[in-house]
Amino acid sequence: MQGKYVIAYDLGTGGLKASLHDASGTTLAFLVCEYPTLYYKEVFHEQRPEDWWQAICRSTRLLLDKVKEQNICKEQICALAISGHSLVGIPMDREGRPLVGQVPIWSDGRAKEQARRFFETHDYNAW
């Protein structure tokens, strides 16, 4: 079992981009798993964390399937790199289960007025 590999995940507005890389940084496989963004009441923009998780699980299986002929297996994955579109908290219970089914994402407009007031006293470029 030679080689160590990294899987990178990028949680975006329209879906998850996932890629598998070797130690030199060469991309060996890439794919996108789409999930919905829920838009309602004009300013509400939300996603379901469960959709994110399912996309990560599905993309991992698909990536490993794509490189199966290169004899790359899950035991050779040494690291995960994860980035996302939002600085969002997901409230969890003591057992690690989400307390809400949907969370706001970066484009949600409900706090527009609060943001405006914040930047009246804080430099936007310094933020």
Tell what function each PLM region has:
Residues 106-127:
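Glycine-rich phosphate-binding loop plus the immediately following alpha-helix
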Residues 1-101, 113, 117:
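N-terminal glycine/serine-rich phosphate-binding loop of ATP-dependent small-molecule kinases
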